[in-house]
């Protein structure tokens, strides 16, 4: 994929709130197939679009990119055939399959900002949208649909269109659901919702932390603070849809390989292995294994 196409693709992914990693080659010591300026996009399923090197380099970029999606932190990745220690702000990976060259690739996870739906044309709703945007959240007016990655929904409409939105958000599992209302009115609204009690109990009303908020801006601030406080631990800046990266060892070269549909893998040809999946860094290792599996008797994998 040429750079112009890759740039357009990044725009499409950001518009659709799809998390990805931008991988950019910043250093190449020959012999390597990649050159500085080569780049790729790595999706959360391990798919790579673009070019950052051959099979073995690509396998390492895939694994470390998924690690950055999980952590939310950028990484300067050094891939080298030599054994080196990590240095400050640089992850060093020994790759025995490289043809003798060294690559450095900057990995930048691009994760959609938390999505918050707001209902209402009230001063509190307007202040919430304004403050949330400053914080870096994606603030949207609720229009009847809720994205699967929605982080919060806040009803600040003073009695208009409350029930349907609250029920929909609760049923669809939105992590934070808040209702701006007095304690008494909020309790009445929640009581009449046509859902079970366990879901009703998840409504935050009066929405916001008890900080003595009085003005619309202060109330909006208290709600944002509560949204932050309710955020699960360990997900600051990371993509919540990822799990810890699972890897297996390439039986031929000993490299770690991400267990992903995007990684090269084959069913072990020995029927006694009961369909064991064996994972490879590249085509060369895959061909070598399939040509003589008995030479790599210690192969492990997933069924």
Language model segments and positions:
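Short Cys/His-rich "knuckle" micro-motifs
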Residues: 260-263, 293
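Segments forming oxygen-rich coordination pockets for charged ligands
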Residues: 1-152, 164, 176, 183, ...
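Short Cys/His-rich metal-coordination motifs, predominantly Zn2+-binding knuckles/fingers
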Residues: 253, 274, 285
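Short cysteine-rich clusters marking metal-coordination/redox-active sites
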Residues: 250-253, 266
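Rossmann-fold NAD(P) dinucleotide-binding segment
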Residues: 161-174
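Cys/His-enriched microdomains
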Residues: 248-251, 276
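Cys/His-rich metal-chelating microdomains
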Residues: 256, 283-284, 288
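Adenosine-phosphate binding glycine-rich loop
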Residues: 180-186, 191-245
